[in-house]
Regions:
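Alpha-helical membrane insertion/targeting regions
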Residues: 2-227
Length: 227
């Protein structure tokens, strides 16, 4: 009996240690993702805002080709809204998921949450309007992939606020996580391409973003996040 009791105690201790390690690794991963995406969000705001205020919107094309076209101002407005809102949601996103803020500062959570939802919708609508007016550099496959991304982000934003209003907190939190997983997609898109460059020296990528790897990336930067 003593041996069995000791064995059961050891098993509980191992399970407890495993749970603690899981919680720590999950929190560490979230902290790394939030910090990195926070910095990337600030970069987006600084880079694209600086080009706007310096009246040098052609600089947008240095990062992503064919983003700015002086002959299509409506498309430029759409993508400008997408960049501005997208930068802010990367900065704000992780804050919405921190338990201590939700518990100790509910008003901060509620008001930043409202802003986060609004900006997510603006980012989605801005990107979708750009695709509808001008289309992406990568053609049909990229148009479909990025349009689906915008639609899913808009739906996730609506569902997040809908369940918050209904006080269905578990559903609200589930959709908030989905929205965050989508929001960091733009950051993951750059990270994935950077890693691919290091590993393969651009195998499957073209300057027109219509290579086989580009076609995969039109969906890969957000769909796995939702699984």
């Amino acid at each position: 009996m003593t041996v069995m009791a000791e064995s059961a105690s050891d098993s509980r201790q191992l399970a407890s240690n495993g749970d603690a390690l899981y919680r720590f690794s999950s929190q560490a991963l979230l902290a790394i993702v939030w910090t990195s995406s926070f910095i990337f969000g600030l970069y987006i705001l600084a880079n694209y805002a600086a080009a706007y205020f310096e009246n040098d919107l052609l600089r947008w094309n240095n990062v992503l080709p064919e983003i700015y076209d002086p002959s299509q101002p409506q498309a430029s407005i759409g993508i400008g809204l997408h960049f501005a809102a997208g930068g802010f949601i990367l900065v704000l996103g992780g804050m919405q998921l921190i338990d201590s803020i939700r518990s100790n500062y509910p008003r901060v959570h509620h008001w930043t949450g409202r802003l986060y939802i609004f900006l997510s919708m603006v980012a989605a609508i801005g990107g979708l309007s750009f695709i509808a007016i001008k289309g992406t550099v990568g053609g049909l496959v990229m148009d479909i992939g990025f349009s689906l991304y915008g639609v899913l982000m808009f739906v996730a934003a609506v569902q997040t606020v809908r369940y918050a209003i209904a006080r269905q907190l578990l559903n609200h939190q589930a959709w908030a996580w989905r929205l965050y997983a989508l929001a960091i997609g733009s950051w993951l898109y750059r990270m994935d391409y950077g890693l691919w460059l290091i590993l393969t020296d651009w195998v499957g990528h073209t300057e027109e973003f219509d290579g086989w790897f580009d076609h995969i990336m039109a969906f890969f930067f957000y769909i796995p996040n939702l699984l």
